[in-house]
Amino acid sequence: MEQTNVRRGGVLLHITSLPGPECAGTLGEAAYRFVDFLQSAGMRIWQVLPVGPTGYGESPYQSACALAGNPYMIDLALLQKDGYLPDYQPAPHAETGRADFETLRAEKEPWLRRAYQHSRDRLLSDGAFEVWQKQWPWLRDYALFMALKQKFNQV
């Protein structure tokens, strides 16, 4: 029987607080390095704040959907490495020690759209998208909601 009262060490750090070339941390190379560091330090737990799309004031606690992931945490360099974004060139940023969500949104949205446009045919042709839609039935309604929200200026 496994003991449930064993002490474990850990850290609370939101993904956007990780270092990296973008205006906020992502689930990319820095996240992998951080997990390796935690393991080497004997830590067993990494607790993060909610990772859904942020709401008013970029609060992770005011998400429009508890099931969706925040697209700004997608690492564009990994999309490039996997062939979804072959022409990606990261914009240079001064290290300020603070996440800049306004700049992040302005820079990242066009790249994410470009990755989709570049890979759309491949993603739709292999049948995985249909399987994915069946596994996640809430996705269609959420996508419609977000499209309408954007169309009507985030109202």
Set out the residue ranges of the language-model regions:
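Acidic/aromatic-lined carbohydrate-recognition and catalytic surfaces
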Residues: 2-155
